[in-house]
Protein backbone atom coordinates (compact mmCIF):
# COMPACT_ATOMS: atom_id res chain seq x y z
CA UNK A 1 0.00 0.00 0.00
CA UNK A 2 1.92 2.99 1.35
CA UNK A 3 5.36 1.79 0.24
CA UNK A 4 4.11 1.17 -3.29
CA UNK A 5 2.61 4.65 -3.38
CA UNK A 6 5.85 6.17 -2.10
CA UNK A 7 7.81 4.22 -4.71
CA UNK A 8 5.51 5.44 -7.49
CA UNK A 9 5.86 9.08 -6.44
CA UNK A 10 9.62 8.82 -6.05
CA UNK A 11 9.90 7.28 -9.50
CA UNK A 12 7.82 10.14 -10.94
CA UNK A 13 10.12 12.67 -9.27
CA UNK A 14 13.26 10.97 -10.53
CA UNK A 15 11.73 10.71 -13.99
CA UNK A 16 11.18 14.49 -14.00
CA UNK A 17 14.76 15.09 -12.90
CA UNK A 18 15.91 12.84 -15.72
CA UNK A 19 13.60 14.50 -18.25
CA UNK A 20 14.97 17.95 -17.43
CA UNK A 21 18.56 16.68 -17.16
CA UNK A 22 18.84 17.54 -13.47
CA UNK A 23 20.03 14.17 -12.16
CA UNK A 24 23.56 15.49 -11.74
CA UNK A 25 22.46 18.34 -9.44
CA UNK A 26 23.23 18.22 -5.77
CA UNK A 27 19.52 18.25 -4.87
CA UNK A 28 18.77 15.03 -6.74
CA UNK A 29 21.29 13.00 -4.75
CA UNK A 30 19.27 12.72 -1.49
CA UNK A 31 16.14 11.90 -3.52
CA UNK A 32 17.82 9.00 -5.30
CA UNK A 33 19.47 7.88 -2.05
CA UNK A 34 16.05 7.82 -0.34
CA UNK A 35 14.61 5.93 -3.30
CA UNK A 36 17.37 3.33 -2.95
CA UNK A 37 16.64 2.95 0.77
CA UNK A 38 12.93 2.46 -0.01
CA UNK A 39 13.72 -0.15 -2.68
CA UNK A 40 15.95 -2.01 -0.24
CA UNK A 41 13.19 -1.98 2.38
CA UNK A 42 10.82 -3.32 -0.29
CA UNK A 43 13.18 -6.26 -0.89
CA UNK A 44 14.42 -4.85 -4.21
CA UNK A 45 18.12 -4.30 -3.43
CA UNK A 46 19.25 -5.04 -7.01
CA UNK A 47 17.12 -2.15 -8.27
CA UNK A 48 18.43 0.05 -5.46
CA UNK A 49 22.04 -0.77 -6.36
CA UNK A 50 21.33 -0.11 -10.02
CA UNK A 51 19.86 3.34 -9.24
CA UNK A 52 22.84 4.27 -7.08
CA UNK A 53 25.37 2.99 -9.62
CA UNK A 54 23.68 5.10 -12.28
CA UNK A 55 23.82 8.10 -9.95
CA UNK A 56 27.51 7.47 -9.21
CA UNK A 57 28.22 7.42 -12.94
CA UNK A 58 26.33 10.70 -13.44
CA UNK A 59 28.22 12.38 -10.56
CA UNK A 60 31.51 11.12 -11.97
CA UNK A 61 30.60 12.44 -15.43
CA UNK A 62 29.31 15.87 -14.37
CA UNK A 63 31.52 16.49 -11.35
CA UNK A 64 34.15 13.93 -10.38
CA UNK A 65 34.64 10.63 -8.62
CA UNK A 66 36.45 12.45 -5.83
CA UNK A 67 33.75 14.70 -4.37
CA UNK A 68 31.49 14.42 -1.32
CA UNK A 69 28.45 13.53 -3.43
CA UNK A 70 30.32 10.59 -4.94
CA UNK A 71 31.50 9.51 -1.48
CA UNK A 72 27.93 9.65 -0.15
CA UNK A 73 26.71 7.41 -2.97
CA UNK A 74 29.61 4.98 -2.40
CA UNK A 75 28.64 4.84 1.27
CA UNK A 76 25.01 4.08 0.34
CA UNK A 77 26.14 1.38 -2.09
CA UNK A 78 28.25 -0.12 0.69
CA UNK A 79 25.32 -0.12 3.10
CA UNK A 80 23.06 -1.96 0.66
CA UNK A 81 25.80 -4.47 -0.17
CA UNK A 82 26.23 -5.06 3.56
CA UNK A 83 22.48 -5.58 4.03
CA UNK A 84 22.50 -8.11 1.19
CA UNK A 85 25.53 -9.88 2.70
CA UNK A 86 27.84 -8.94 -0.18
CA UNK A 87 30.60 -8.15 2.29
CA UNK A 88 33.53 -7.81 -0.12
CA UNK A 89 31.61 -5.39 -2.34
CA UNK A 90 30.48 -3.43 0.72
CA UNK A 91 34.09 -3.16 1.82
CA UNK A 92 35.12 -1.85 -1.63
CA UNK A 93 32.44 0.86 -1.60
CA UNK A 94 33.19 1.89 1.99
CA UNK A 95 36.92 2.14 1.24
CA UNK A 96 36.22 4.38 -1.77
CA UNK A 97 33.98 6.61 0.35
CA UNK A 98 36.42 6.80 3.25
CA UNK A 99 39.35 7.66 0.95
CA UNK A 100 37.38 10.61 -0.43
CA UNK A 101 36.34 11.74 3.06
CA UNK A 102 39.98 11.54 4.23
CA UNK A 103 41.18 13.66 1.31
CA UNK A 104 38.42 16.26 1.43
CA UNK A 105 38.35 16.55 5.21
CA UNK A 106 42.12 16.28 5.69
CA UNK A 107 42.06 19.25 8.07
CA UNK A 108 38.97 18.03 9.94
CA UNK A 109 39.94 14.70 11.54
CA UNK A 110 36.84 14.69 13.78
CA UNK A 111 34.59 14.45 10.69
CA UNK A 112 36.66 11.57 9.34
CA UNK A 113 36.52 9.81 12.71
CA UNK A 114 32.74 10.28 12.79
CA UNK A 115 32.42 8.61 9.36
CA UNK A 116 34.61 5.69 10.42
CA UNK A 117 32.44 5.16 13.50
CA UNK A 118 29.22 5.43 11.51
CA UNK A 119 30.40 2.84 8.99
CA UNK A 120 31.79 0.58 11.70
CA UNK A 121 28.40 0.61 13.45
CA UNK A 122 26.85 -0.88 10.31
CA UNK A 123 28.88 -4.04 10.76
CA UNK A 124 27.57 -5.76 13.92
CA UNK A 125 25.62 -8.31 11.88
CA UNK A 126 28.70 -9.09 9.81
CA UNK A 127 31.07 -9.16 12.75
CA UNK A 128 33.31 -6.61 14.37
CA UNK A 129 36.45 -8.24 12.99
CA UNK A 130 35.33 -7.38 9.50
CA UNK A 131 34.82 -3.73 10.41
CA UNK A 132 38.30 -3.57 11.87
CA UNK A 133 39.75 -5.03 8.69
CA UNK A 134 38.65 -2.02 6.60
CA UNK A 135 39.64 0.60 9.14
CA UNK A 136 43.25 1.76 9.48
CA UNK A 137 44.93 0.85 12.74
CA UNK A 138 45.55 3.74 15.12
CA UNK A 139 49.06 4.07 16.52
What are these regions (language model features)?
Residues 1, 15-16, 23, 30, ...:
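Tandem repeat protein-protein interaction scaffolds
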Residues 14-19, 53-61, 98-102:
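Amphipathic alpha-helical segments of tetratricopeptide repeats
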Residues 19-24, 61-66, 103-110:
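Short coil/turn linkers that connect adjacent helices within long alpha-helical scaffolds
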Residues 26-41, 68-79, 113-124:
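Conserved alpha-helical positions within TPR/SEL1-like repeat arrays
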Residues 79, 94-95, 99, 107:
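Long, ordered, amphipathic alpha-helical scaffolds
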Residues 106-139:
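Terminal, low-structured helical/coil segments at or just beyond the last alpha-helical repeat
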Amino acid sequence: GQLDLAKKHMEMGISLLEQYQLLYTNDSIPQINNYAVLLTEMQEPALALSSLQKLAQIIKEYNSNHCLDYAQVQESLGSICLITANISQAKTHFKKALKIYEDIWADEPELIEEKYKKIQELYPQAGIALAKSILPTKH
